[in-house]
Each structure stands twice: as C-alpha cells, then as structure tokens.
C-alpha cells in the first residue's frame, strides 16, 4: 500500500537532552579509545562531516530557503535558520576580513555542553564540539562550497564564548554541475 501523495513526510524528533547525553557518552568513549586529542578531534570532525552531507538534504527540504548570492547570505542562513532548526539557538555572526569570506559564529549558549562542566583531565586540546565543525563543512560541501571550519574559542577552555570560524576557500565551478543545454 502506498502513501497518499498529499501527505507530508513525518520528521522524528529526538529529545534534546537525550541527544546531548548520548553525545557526551560518545566523546567519553572516544577519549578512552584514542590517546591523542588530535585523533578524537579528527574522528568527531569526520563523523560530523558524514552527518552534514546527509543533513543538508533535510535542511533544504524543510526550510524552503532560496538560492544565496553571497557568503554573508549563506552564513546568515546557517546561523538564523539551521542552528535554530536543529539546536534551538541563534548564534551571532561577524565578518572577519575585508574580502568577506571569513566569518565567525558566536554561540552565547552551546546546547552540546549543557551538562559538561570542564574538559577531562589531560585533554586540554580536545575540541569537544568538533562534530559541529564537521557538520557545517559537510553541508557546505554538498552545496558545492569548500570551507575551512574550526573552533576559535571554546567556553570549555575558559573562553567567554564559543566561536566557530568559517573560511570559504573558493566557490566551485558551477558550470561543472549544471546540465548541458
């Protein structure tokens, strides 16, 4: 039996607290499995990248955003729509250079660290939320935008805010991706 054509797809929501606690358990297990913080950071980024490449389809289907014409429009959509949709927060945006390809997302509140007081002992270079960087990078790559995404500041490391830096490297050649006429 097939679904009626007019029926909207159902989206399953997971409890935010369950997700945050599960993520914390994942990071704790990775810290046990890997001795070096760099390996944990790389694994979290890789996981996030995989999530981002799939999440972008859901985002585009649910948000109905149009085509963006500048990097600043893209960053505003990420901050005001994507973060709000998936994490329930709206980070502030700053542009970091005159060529307008470097931006920062400043999170006053980071839901992923809601139940975390500090980084584990001896893990000072751990980027606990590196999953977010991978998600953003993966999603941008799926819409043909190469970007470098890193944490610039982290509350878990004593900074006053959490800041994610996004640098657009270059716009990919769109002619390659357009159908031939």
From Swiss-Prot:
Compartments it resides in: Golgi apparatus, cis-Golgi network; Endoplasmic reticulum
Transmembrane segments: none
Domain of life: Eukaryota
Lipid-substituted positions (S-palmitoyl cysteine): 68
Record's keyword terms, sorted: Endoplasmic reticulum, ER-Golgi transport, Golgi apparatus, Lipoprotein, Palmitate, Transport
A Pfam family this chain is assigned to: TRAPP
Presence of keyword Transcription regulation: no
InterPro entries assigned: Bet3, NO_sig/Golgi_transp_ligand-bd, TRAPP_component
CDD domains recorded: TRAPPC3_bet3 (cd14942)
Chief location of this protein within or outside the cell: Golgi
Oxidoreductase keyword on record: no
One record GO biological process: endoplasmic reticulum to Golgi vesicle-mediated transport
GO cellular component, one term: TRAPP complex
Family membership: Belongs to the TRAPP small subunits family. BET3 subfamily.
Quaternary structure annotation from Swiss-Prot or TrEMBL: Homodimer. Component of the multisubunit TRAPP (transport protein particle) complex, which includes at least TRAPPC2, TRAPPC2L, TRAPPC3, TRAPPC3L, TRAPPC4, TRAPPC5, TRAPPC8, TRAPPC9, TRAPPC10, TRAPPC11 and TRAPPC12.
Function: May play a role in vesicular transport from endoplasmic reticulum to Golgi.
Protein known as: Trafficking protein particle complex subunit 3-like protein
